[in-house]
């Protein structure tokens, strides 16, 4: 019986950290890899790469824990989230706080192996991860904060490699914010009706009938900024082909969200994993001269 209870608790932690749903970690991973490949260029040190990949998974898990902790009073009223570990009672509030601290401490220990500039930037990363879940109560722009949180690994990656944050770094950071607002608005479109009822704010609610148009504008902005980064860094044909493929994926997403159906909007959100992957492959091909 003791083992059964322990096993159930571990499974609840597993669900709380979303390790059963890797999409969030992947959307955080791709911009991190973009930054490491541009900063190095193309040949990141193995230890730095390992630290950032591990950090992505750990901090994404920590972000999910604090997000569910912040939303624990609301999730029970939303059909999609009612069975999450905190509202269902599978994990207590005290356990969630302890798990968050453990994940953050492990992440910080990894960062301590890097240079001072990266360590200082990591403090801002923690602040963004903590603040984001609470923003949806006070502003319709929590997706902007999410974009900053998901993109903060970009200046950290540049700092870890060269102890500098050049123009390409900040253009990539801005591109990631636009991309995050676009894909998280698609995600928020799934819960829009429930969010209106319980008073949760989002860009999906703010944009209203113009949601598809604004998502499209942001997607074009992502492609334009990534093209500028390619020009600044002298990237090759493989990279620009990847931008074209990413553009085709964005067109496909627009087709999916055309009627604002929940399942289709969620499918569009999930499709962004391929956008990140394609752009990374383009960078790899450019630097490796395939």
UniProtKB/Swiss-Prot annotation:
Cellular location(s): Cell inner membrane
Chief place of localization: membrane
Topological relation to the membrane, as annotated: Multi-pass membrane protein
Catalytic activity: all-trans-octaprenyl diphosphate + 4-hydroxybenzoate = 4-hydroxy-3-(all-trans-octaprenyl)benzoate + diphosphate
E.C. designation(s): 2.5.1.39
A Pfam cross-reference name: UbiA
TM region positions: 23-43, 46-66, 99-119, 141-161, 163-183, 213-233, 234-254, 268-288
Pathway(s) per entry: Cofactor biosynthesis; ubiquinone biosynthesis
One GO cellular component term: plasma membrane
Record-level Gene Ontology MF annotations: 4-hydroxybenzoate polyprenyltransferase activity
BP-aspect Gene Ontology terms: ubiquinone biosynthetic process
InterPro entries in the record: HB_polyprenyltransferase-like, Prenyltransferase, UbiA_prenyltransferase, UbiA_prenylTrfase_CS, UbiA_sf
EC main group: transferase
Keywords: Cell inner membrane, Cell membrane, Magnesium, Membrane, Transferase, Transmembrane, Transmembrane helix, Ubiquinone biosynthesis
Co-factor(s): Mg(2+)
Similarity comment: family membership: Belongs to the UbiA prenyltransferase family.
HAMAP family assigned: UbiA
Function: Catalyzes the prenylation of para-hydroxybenzoate (PHB) with an all-trans polyprenyl group. Mediates the second step in the final reaction sequence of ubiquinone-8 (UQ-8) biosynthesis, which is the condensation of the polyisoprenoid side chain with PHB, generating the first membrane-bound Q intermediate 3-octaprenyl-4-hydroxybenzoate.
UniProt protein name: 4-hydroxybenzoate octaprenyltransferase
Organism: Escherichia coli O1:K1 / APEC
The encoding gene: ubiA
């Amino acid at each position: 019986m003791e083992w059964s209870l322990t096993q159930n608790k571990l499974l609840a932690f597993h669900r709380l950290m979303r390790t059963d749903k890797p999409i969030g970690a992947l959307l955080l991973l791709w911009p991190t890899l973009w930054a490491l490949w541009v900063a190095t260029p193309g040949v990141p040190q193995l230890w730095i790469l390992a630290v950032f990949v591990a950090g992505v998974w750990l901090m994404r898990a920590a972000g999910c824990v604090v997000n569910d902790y912040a939303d624990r009073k609301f999730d029970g009223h939303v059909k999609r989230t009612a069975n999450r570990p905190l509202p269902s009672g599978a994990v207590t509030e005290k356990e969630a706080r302890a798990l968050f601290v453990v994940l953050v401490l492990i992440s910080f220990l990894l960062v301590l192996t890097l240079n001072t500039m990266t360590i200082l930037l990591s403090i801002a990363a923690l602040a963004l991860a903590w603040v984001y879940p609470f923003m949806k109560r006070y502003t319709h722009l929590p997706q902007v904060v999410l974009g900053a949180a998901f993109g903060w690994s970009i200046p950290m990656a540049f700092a870890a490699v060269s102890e500098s944050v050049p123009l390409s770094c900040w253009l990539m950071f801005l591109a990631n914010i636009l991309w995050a607002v676009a894909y998280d608005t698609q995600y928020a479109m799934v819960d829009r009706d429930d969010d209106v009822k319980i008073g949760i704010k989002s860009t999906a609610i703010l944009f209203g009938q113009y949601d598809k148009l604004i998502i499209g504008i942001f997607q074009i902005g992502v492609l334009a900024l990534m093209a500028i980064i390619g020009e600044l860094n002298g990237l090759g044909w493989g990279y620009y082909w990847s931008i074209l493929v990413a553009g085709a994926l964005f067109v496909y997403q627009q087709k999916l969200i055309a009627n604002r159906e929940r399942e289709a909007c969620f499918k569009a959100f999930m499709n962004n994993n391929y956008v990140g992957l394609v752009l990374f492959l383009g960078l790899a091909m450019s630097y490796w001269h395939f």
